[in-house]
């Protein structure tokens, strides 16, 4: 019988400090998350310096709690995994330095994990029988991609944003209509009270005919222009209609391109990953389109959509099998790309 691989994973790329113990990439023994949302809400967005300081305060306790919840000793671990990018450099360094210290002190291999790969791997935890190849729509505050997962750790990017990520556009529009941070959940909630067909916000058009790329900066500008025009005319702004119409434009763009990619790649499974995968409109719309096209749609749980260390532990397991380890010179790479 093969030995179980137990990995302690650490995630600190933005405003969540998280540690988890994951067995064989799919079984989560613990997944402790310390969120800073309440702190950053006052500032209307994540303040990098504040995020780094809060990570420093939380990380020891979070790691200790993850080990305790897993009912395990440090010596039983097979490896230490950590997010090294993309993300905020100061925030990444906190998790990275802590993981390096553990790796050195315990004499356990260190595994540097790409945060985007972690989001994709959250689906392996939720869906125990999911195996490549499949298509994955990765959509979060910092990233928007359509990825063909050829094998574990092997990816082909089929479409990506050329400017703002979808989650970034949500945050900016939420700020403009006075909802504050975090924009995604607040727009999702308000949109339920609005008419999604009330305002026609345009979708980006590209010169290249067959591209599956995204662009959200023009859509964001259209919303801002609409708000300015209404204010100049001194007309009342229905915030729920703005939220619903904006959300429909984003979700339709995401789902249309993903379905086109599925046809090109002839896949019968699409996984969705990243913070925006928690969005109720995106979930409903892509499931309906999946049913029409006979494609199975997979999501992680809401907890696994947002930043967490369990997904990092899952991705790390498949790197462990390839002996894809890092040395103690591993550094934070804030603009890290997904390996193609």
Curated annotation (Swiss-Prot):
Binding annotation for Fe cation: 115, 119, 307
Cofactor(s) for this UniProt protein: Fe(2+)
Signal peptide positions (record): none
Gene3D superfamilies: 3.30.420.40
Gene Ontology MF term list: iron ion binding; N(6)-L-threonylcarbamoyladenine synthase activity
Subcellular location, record wording: Cytoplasm
Similarity field: Belongs to the KAE1 / TsaD family.
Protein name as annotated: tRNA N6-adenosine threonylcarbamoyltransferase
Organism of derivation: Clostridium tetani (strain Massachusetts / E88)
Gene: tsaD
């Amino acid at each position: 019988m093969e030995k179980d691989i137990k990995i302690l994973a650490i995630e600190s790329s933005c405003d969540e400090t998280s540690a988890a113990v994951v067995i064989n990439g799919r079984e989560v023994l613990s997944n402790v998350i310390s969120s800073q949302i309440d702190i950053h809400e006052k500032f209307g967005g994540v303040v990098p310096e504040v995020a780094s300081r809060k990570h420093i305060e939380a990380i020891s306790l979070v790691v200790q709690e993850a080990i305790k919840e897993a009912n395990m000793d440090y010596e039983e671990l097979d490896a230490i995994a950590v997010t090294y990018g993309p993300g905020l450099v100061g925030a990444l360094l906190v998790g990275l330095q802590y993981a390096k210290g553990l790796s050195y002190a315990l004499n356990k291999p260190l595994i540097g994990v790409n945060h985007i790969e972690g989001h994709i791997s959250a689906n392996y935890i939720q869906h125990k029988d999911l195996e490549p190849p499949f298509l994955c729509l990765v959509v979060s505050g910092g990233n928007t991609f359509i990825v063909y997962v050829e094998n574990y750790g092997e990816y082909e990017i089929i479409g990506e944003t050329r400017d703002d990520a979808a989650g970034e556009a949500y945050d900016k529009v939420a700020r403009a209509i006075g909802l504050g941070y975090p924009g995604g959940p607040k727009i999702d909630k308000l949109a339920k009270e609005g008419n999604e067909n009330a305002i026609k916000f345009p979708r980006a058009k590209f010169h290249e005919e067959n591209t599956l790329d995204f662009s959200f900066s023009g859509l964001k500008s259209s919303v801002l222009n609409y708000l300015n025009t209404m204010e100049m005319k001194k007309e009342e702004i229905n915030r729920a209609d703005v939220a619903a119409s904006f959300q429909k434009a984003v979700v339709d763009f995401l789902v249309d391109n993903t379905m086109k990619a599925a046809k090109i790649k002839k896949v019968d499974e699409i996984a969705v990953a990243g913070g925006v995968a928690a969005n109720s409109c995106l979930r409903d719309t892509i499931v309906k389109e999946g049913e029409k096209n006979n494609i199975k749609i997979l999501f992680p749980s809401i907890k696994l959509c947002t930043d967490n260390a369990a997904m990092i532990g899952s991705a790390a397991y498949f790197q462990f099998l390839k002996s894809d380890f890092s040395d103690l010179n591993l550094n934070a790479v804030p603009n890290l790309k997904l390996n193609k």
